[in-house]
């Protein structure tokens, strides 16, 4: 670190936070660690994790940052660990609303009909993300809207399970398993509804990006997702039951007034709280003051 003239070590991997804080301390430079999610410890390791946090902060002078209200509260209330809250961010030059002409042009490019009702999820396939819940309700959704399509972006440990479930339910031709995509906005702007069914999040960056594209969001009411409605109604928060997805989608399709309000509130909120230039400046100040 001294040889390369490093001024700050910013660590994101939880298993490295104490080690990197020690390295920074020995090198006489500043260190920052970012908590990205609402972690919980097993009873046997709880006190150890509290000690790691306390010693890194008080003995090694590491500054702790959290990315959302839920993560901040989790650290403060569960681990008795005060942190500096600086929200995550998105780039508004990469994620922005589409007009009708662009939406239809991209739908044509992707082979999606003008009158299709498109739902989308974006994220790695895992037990935490619970994409199974979305697939399970497709038969019920198709009873009301036969031209429905589910754009499934992401892959991971449960991808094959999800494909097997789709075949079992006979809805595989209504799902496009797109895997990981670089041009996520292209898929967001052709969608009518964004879904996130996680057990928990730190803060969902893909939800921020969807709201920035003015796509209405239906979210499970869990830590890291309920943050989006902390100030006002910016999404539809629903209980953690797949059947609630059907009710929420029907509500958005039949109540245009509430849908437009959610879109407006969500867009204004992410531009205010998760705007890249503003939050990056806060990170830079943290580096200078750490």
Model-identified regions with their sequence ranges:
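A conserved mid-protein helix/loop that constitutes part of the nucleotide-sugar donor-binding site
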Residues: 117-140, 157-160, 205
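A short helix/loop element that forms part of the nucleotide-sugar donor recognition site in Leloir-type
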Residues: 96-112, 258
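Aromatic "clamp/platform" in nucleotide-sugar-dependent glycosyltransferases that forms part
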Residues: 180, 199
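A short, active-site helix/loop in glycosyltransferases that binds the activated sugar's phosphate group
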Residues: 59-85, 89-97
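Nucleotide-sugar donor phosphate/pyrophosphate-binding loop at the beta->alpha transition
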Residues: 30, 39-60
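Short hydrophobic beta-strand element within catalytic cores of glycosyltransferases
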Residues: 216-219, 229
């Amino acid at each position: 670190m001294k040889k390369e003239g490093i001024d700050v070590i910013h660590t994101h991997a939880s298993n490295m936070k104490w080690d990197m804080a020690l390295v920074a301390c020995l090198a006489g430079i500043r260190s920052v660690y970012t908590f990205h999610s609402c972690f919980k410890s097993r009873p046997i390791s709880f006190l150890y994790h509290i000690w790691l946090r306390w010693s890194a902060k008080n003995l090694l002078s590491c500054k702790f940052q959290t990315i959302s209200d839920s993560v901040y509260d989790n650290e403060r209330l569960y681990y008795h660990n005060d942190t500096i809250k600086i929200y995550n961010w998105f780039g508004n030059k990469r994620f922005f609303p589409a007009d009708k002409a662009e939406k239809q042009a991209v739908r044509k490019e992707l082979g999606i009909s003008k009158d299709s009702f498109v739902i989308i999820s974006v994220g790695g396939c895992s037990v935490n993300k619970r994409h199974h819940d979305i697939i399970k309700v497709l038969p019920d959704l198709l009873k009301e809207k036969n031209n429905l399509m589910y754009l499934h972006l992401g892959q991971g440990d449960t991808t094959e399970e999800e494909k097997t479930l789709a075949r079992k339910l006979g809805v595989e031709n209504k799902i496009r398993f797109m895997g990981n995509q670089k041009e996520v906005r292209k898929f967001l702007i052709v969608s009518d509804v964004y879904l996130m069914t996680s057990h928990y999040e730190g803060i969902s960056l893909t939800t921020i990006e969807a709201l920035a594209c003015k796509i209405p969001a239906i979210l499970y009411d869990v830590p890291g997702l309920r943050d989006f409605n902390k100030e006002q109604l910016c999404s539809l928060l629903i209980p953690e039951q797949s059947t609630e997805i059907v009710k929420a989608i029907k509500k958005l399709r039949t109540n245009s007034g509430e849908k437009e309000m959610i879109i407006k509130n969500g867009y204004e909120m992410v531009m205010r709280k998760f705007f890249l230039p503003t939050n990056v400046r806060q990170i830079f100040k943290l580096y200078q003051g750490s």
